[in-house]
A protein has these predicted regions:
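Conserved small/polar residues in nucleotide/adenosyl-binding loops
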Residues: 316-318
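Juxta-kinase regulatory segment immediately upstream of eukaryotic protein kinase catalytic domains
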Residues: 1-32
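An alpha-helical support segment within catalytic cores of ATP-dependent transferases
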Residues: 18-28, 154-158, 174-216, 226-228, ...
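A cross-family kinase active-site recognition segment
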Residues: 129-186, 211
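ATP-binding pocket architecture of kinase catalytic cores
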Residues: 54-157
Length: 318
C-alpha cells in the first residue's frame, strides 16, 4: 500500500461536538425554545445535527477541521444557484443572525466552519426499501429527478469546482496505490481488473464527454421519497461530493447503488436511464458508457471502504 496516498479530510476525525454544543451553535441561525430537540445524524467526514424547535427544523453542519473554506463556499453557492433555476425540493442555505452563511467556530478545540441548511420532509429511500412495490416507477422517478437537478446546475461554475475529492471518477487510477488494503484476494483481483478496464478503455472515452458540475452522490441515504407513494422521489440531500465532472457520471453513481441492491446491472440501470433521458437527453456516447462507469463506481466503493477500514476510519456512507 502506498503510504503517500492521503485524503486528510477523510482521515481526520470528525469534530467533537455533543448535543449541548450543537444547540449553542444553532441559536445563531434559528429561534430556539425550551422544547428544542437535537438529534445527531450520521455523516462521512463532518458532524451534522437535526435541530427541531416549535417553529422549524433545520440541519446544523459542522465541517471537518481539514475541510477548506472554498469547498464549502462552492456548495453554498450551488444551493443558492439552484434556488433560482429549479423548483426541486432541495436544502436551502440559511443565513445566521449576522447575515452570514458560513462562520468559523472553535468546536472541540479545533476551528471548524459551521453552517445551516433547511430540513427536508421525506423518508430516506434506504429506510423504506422493504415496502417498495414498484421498482420500475421508483427508478424512473429517480432518473427524472436527477436529470432536473443536472439541468438546474448546468451553466453554474465556481473557482473551487475542481477541488480534490476521493469520490471523483477522475481519481480512479490513484486507487491502484491502495489495492493492497483489500485482504480478500478474489475481491482484490476483481477491483484491479476494474481499475485496469477504466485505465485502458473508459478513461479516454470519458474525456470526450460533456462536463459540468454534478451532485455525484445519488445513493439511497440521500434520496427522499414520499411516505404515501414510496416510488416517488420528493427530494435529495447531501451536496458534499459535488464537483465538475462528466455529466453521465452523475447517473452512473445512482446506477451503481441500485445495481448493488438488485444484483443486476441491467435492472439497476435501464429505468434510471429512461427516466433521466425523458427529462435531459443523453448522447449515445454517454449512454454507452453508463455500464462501464457504474462498474467503476462499484469498484471504487469497495477499494475506498477497504482503505478506510485499514486506517480504522468510519465506513458510514460508503
Amino acid at each position: 500500500m502506498n503510504s503517500n496516498f492521503s485524503f486528510p479530510v477523510l482521515e481526520h476525525p470528525a469534530p467533537n461536538c455533543d448535543n449541548k454544543n450543537a444547540l449553542d451553535l444553532a441559536k445563531d441561525w434559528m429561534q430556539l425554545d425550551q422544547n428544542s430537540i437535537v438529534t445527531p445524524l450520521v455523516s462521512e467526514r463532518d458532524r451534522n445535527f437535526l435541530i427541531s424547535s416549535n417553529q422549524e427544523k433545520a440541519i446544523l453542519k459542522i465541517s471537518n477541521h481539514k475541510e477548506e473554506r472554498g469547498v464549502l463556499e462552492f456548495q453554498t453557492e450551488a444551493l443558492l444557484h439552484l434556488q433560482k433555476t429549479t423548483s426541486l425540493n432541495l436544502p436551502r442555505a440559511k443565513k445566521n443572525i449576522d447575515g452570514e452563511y458560513l462562520v468559523t467556530k472553535n468546536v472541540g478545540g479545533e476551528d471548524c466552519f459551521v453552517r445551516m441548511v433547511t430540513y427536508l420532509e421525506g423518508i430516506p429511500l434506504d429506510d423504506i426499501r422493504a415496502v417498495i412495490i414498484d421498482p420500475k416507477m421508483l427508478h424512473l422517478s429517480m432518473g427524472n429527478f436527477l436529470a432536473k437537478l443536472g439541468k438546474g446546475l448546468d451553466g453554474f461554475s465556481h473557482p473551487n469546482q475542481n477541488h480534490p475529492l476521493l469520490w471523483d471518477v477522475g481519481k480512479t487510477e490513484s486507487l491502484f496505490d491502495v489495492l493492497g488494503g483489500i485482504q480478500d484476494e478474489q475481491k482484490r483481483k476483481m477491483a484491479e481488473l476494474a481499475l485496469l478496464y477504466y485505465q485502458n478503455n473508459t478513461k479516454e472515452l470519458l474525456s470526450e464527454q460533456r462536463k459540468q458540475i454534478i451532485h455525484n452522490d445519488m445513493n439511497p441515504d440521500n434520496v427522499l421519497v414520499s411516505k404515501e407513494d414510496p416510488s416517488s422521489v420528493v427530494g435529495m440531500i447531501d451536496f458534499g461530493d459535488m464537483l465538475y465532472a462528466p455529466l453521465i457520471n452523475d447517473l452512473a453513481v445512482a446506477c451503481a447503488y441500485e445495481t448493488i441492491r438488485v444484483e443486476s446491472l441491467y435492472s439497476g440501470s435501464k429505468d434510471l436511464l429512461l427516466g433521466y433521458h425523458s427529462e435531459n437527453n443523453l448522447l449515445e456516447s454517454e449512454a454507452m458508457l453508463l455500464p462501464m462507469l457504474a462498474y467503476n463506481r462499484i469498484a471504487m466503493s469497495l477499494i475506498i471502504s477497504e482503505w478506510r477500514a485499514s486506517k480504522h476510519l468510519s465506513l458510514i456512507h460508503i
